[in-house]
From Swiss-Prot:
Induction annotation: VP1 and VP2 are detected 12 hours post infection, while VP3 only after 24 hours.
Protein purpose: May act as transcriptional regulator. Induces apoptosis in infected cells. Element of infectious replication cycle.
Source organism per UniProt: Chicken anemia virus (isolate USA CIA-1)
Intracellular or extracellular location(s): Host nucleus
The entry's keywords: Apoptosis, Early protein, Host nucleus, Host-virus interaction, Inhibition of host mitotic exit by virus, Modulation of host cell cycle by virus
Name recorded for this polypeptide: Apoptin
Domain of life assignment: Viruses
Highest classification ranks of the organism: Viruses, Viruses incertae sedis, Anelloviridae, Gyrovirus, Gyrovirus chickenanemia
Region named Disordered: 1-28, 57-121
Bias type Polar residues, positions: 58-70
Family in the record: Belongs to the gyrovirus apoptin family.
The keyword Nucleotidyltransferase appears for this protein: no
């Protein structure tokens, strides 16, 4: 049996309630989602939700909805891990080893020059 009566008019499914706090909504338990539709950007702040990673942000027109979008669209995800940076060693012995290698390369003597004389006959 259906829980709703048939003569009940349909009501709104969602109600907008503005935030009651002035503190920023972006907390470890809040995520902000931006959805772009035909030049309009909709920003949603979702608090208390789990993380879900999207493979990438792409654009597709309504005419060609199966398209994956443009390759030149910038990736706007902010939660991406940064690529690992080159770490420099602070160990002085490693610095000395590389310094010695450089000095060996630059100071390796080439063949000694010999004087060439031209003899005219």
């Amino acid at each position: 049996m259906n829980a709703l009566q048939e003569d009940t008019p349909p009501g709104p499914s969602t109600v907008f309630r503005p935030p009651t706090s002035s503190r920023p909504l972006e907390t470890p338990h809040c995520r902000e989602i931006r959805i772009g539709i035909a030049g309009i950007t909709i920003t949603l702040s979702l608090c208390g939700c789990a993380n879900a990673r999207a493979p990438t942000l792409r654009s597709a027109t309504a005419d060609n909805s199966e398209s994956t979008g443009f390759k030149n669209v910038p990736d706007l995800r902010t939660d991406q891990p940064k690529p690992p940076s080159k770490k420099r060693s602070c160990d002085p012995s490693e610095y000395r080893v590389s310094e010695l290698k450089e000095s060996l390369i630059t100071t390796t003597p080439s063949r000694p020059r010999t004087a060439r004389r031209c003899i005219r006959l």
